Swiss-Prot record:
Catalytic residues as annotated in Swiss-Prot or TrEMBL: 21
Keywords, ordered alphabetically: Cell membrane, Hydrolase, Membrane, Metal-binding, Metalloprotease, Protease, Transmembrane, Transmembrane helix, Zinc
Protein name listed in UniProt: Putative zinc metalloprotease CA_C1796
Protein source organism: Clostridium acetobutylicum (strain ATCC 824 / DSM 792 / JCM 1419 / IAM 19013 / LMG 5710 / NBRC 13948 / NRRL B-527 / VKM B-1787 / 2291 / W)
A Pfam family recorded for this sequence: PDZ_6
Length: 339
C-alpha cells in the first residue's frame, strides 16, 4: 500500500465527509440552530478557525466528521438549541447529511456517464453460440427484470450476474412494447472467471446533459438497491464476512482507481458516496438513520423519548461501531484485496 494510495484515499474520503457534514450544517443554519463546531476528521485538532459563533476545524483522524450543535448532547434552555426544535426540524437536519451524499453520487455518476458514455440495459451485441443467442435474445431487447429484480441500469444486470453460480436466470425482455420472459443457464468464462450469458450493452457514446442526469440518478438508485441486497445476503448467510471491506481495502481500491485514470477515480468516489449515504440511513444507534427513526417515531406517536436514554443508547451504538471498524480493519489485513 503506497503513500500515494493513502493520500488519494484521505483526500477522497475528506470530500465525502465535507459534503455529508455540510448537509447537516446548512440545514442547522436554516432551522436557526446554533452550530458550535464544524469538524472534518476526528481526534486531536490540527487546524482551527473561529467564525462568528462556529469553530471550523480539521482533526487528525480521517475517519469521519461532525457538526456539534448546541443541545445535541445535553439539554439547553436556549431557543436556538437543537433539543428545543421540533422533531420535524431535527429530522431535516439529521437526514440532510446522507441525502447530500446521494446527491453527490448522482452528480459524479452523471460526470462519468457524460465522459465515458452510458451503457444501457439494452442488448447491443450477442456472442455466437452463447446462451443468449440459443434462447432467442436479440439486439435491441431491453432487460426490464432479472430474477424478479427490476432493472434500471446495466449495473443491475452486472451485479446479478456476478452473484450467479451457474443457476438458471429469469429475464423479462421488452421490445416494441412487448414483454417476453425467458429462462437460460449461463456458461462459465475462464477468461472473465464468472458465469456469462453472452450479451453486451448498447452504448450512448455522446449523451446529452438530460441523459447524463438520468443515468446519474438511475445509477445512484442501483447503488442503493445493491447495498441493501448485499446486507440482506450477509444477514441470510448468502455472503461471507470476508466480502466486507474496511479502511485498508478502501485505500487500496481508491489507489487502484486513481491509477486507472481520473474518471475511474470519480466513479469509485461516487460509489463510496452512495454507500455512505445508504449506510448512514440504517436505523442503527449513533448513525443518522437511528435519529431519523427516533424523530419519525416521535412525529407519528406524539411521544417524546427521554434525551438521556437516547444519549446512552447512542453511546453504546458508537462504541459498537468503533469495535466493528477495528474488526474489519483486522479482516483487511488477514484477508487482503490484491491487485
Amino acid at each position: 500500500m503506497s503513500f500515494f494510495n493513502i493520500v488519494i484515499a484521505i483526500l477522497a474520503f475528506g470530500v465525502l465527509i465535507l459534503i455529508h457534514e455540510l448537509g447537516h450544517f446548512v440545514l442547522a443554519k436554516l432551522n436557526d440552530v446554533k452550530v458550535e463546531e464544524f469538524a472534518i476528521g476526528m481526534g486531536p485538532k490540527l487546524l482551527g478557525i473561529k467564525g462568528k459563533e462556529t469553530q471550523y476545524s480539521i482533526r487528525a483522524l480521517p475517519i469521519g466528521g461532525y457538526v456539534k450543535m448546541l443541545g445535541d448532547e445535553s439539554k439547553s434552555d436556549d431557543p436556538r438549541a437543537f433539543n428545543n426544535k421540533s422533531s420535524a426540524r431535527r429530522l431535516s437536519i439529521v437526514i440532510a447529511g446522507p441525502i447530500m451524499n446521494l446527491i453527490l453520487a448522482a452528480v459524479l455518476f452523471c460526470i462519468v456517464g457524460m465522459s465515458e458514455g452510458i451503457a444501457l440495459p439494452t442488448v447491443g451485441k450477442i456472442s455466437a453460440n452463447s446462451p443468449a443467442q440459443k434462447i432467442g435474445i436479440k439486439a435491441g431487447d431491453t432487460i426490464v427484470k432479472i430474477n424478479n429484480y427490476s432493472v434500471h441500469t446495466w449495473e443491475d444486470i452486472s451485479f446479478n450476474m456476478a452473484l450467479n453460480k451457474g443457476e438458471g436466470i429469469k429475464l423479462a425482455l421488452k421490445n416494441n412494447g412487448t414483454i417476453k420472459k425467458v429462462t437460460l443457464v449461463p456458461q462459465y468464462s475462464k477468461k472473465e472467471k464468472m458465469y456469462l450469458i453472452g450479451i453486451s450493452p448498447k452504448f450512448i457514446d455522446k449523451p446529452t446533459i438530460i441523459e447524463g442526469a438520468k443515468y446519474g440518478t438511475s445509477e445512484t438508485v442501483t447503488m442503493i438497491k445493491t447495498v441493501y441486497l448485499s446486507l440482506k445476503m450477509m444477514v441470510t448467510g448468502k455472503a461471507s464476512a470476508k466480502d466486507v471491506s474496511g479502511p485498508v481495502s478502501i485505500i487500496k481500491v481508491t489507489g487502484a482507481a486513481a491509477n486507472a485514470g481520473f474518471i475511474r477515480l470519480v466513479n469509485f468516489i461516487a460509489f463510496i458516496s452512495a454507500q455512505l449515504g445508504v449506510m448512514n440511513l440504517l436505523p442503527i444507534p449513533a448513525l443518522d438513520g437511528g435519529f431519523v427513526f427516533l424523530f419519525l417515531f416521535q412525529m407519528i406517536t406524539g411521544k417524546k423519548v427521554d434525551d438521556d436514554k437516547v444519549g446512552f443508547v447512542n453511546t453504546i451504538g458508537f462504541a459498537l461501531l468503533m469495535i466493528l471498524m477495528i474488526v474489519v480493519t483486522i479482516k483487511d489485513v488477514v484477508y487482503p484485496i490484491n491487485f
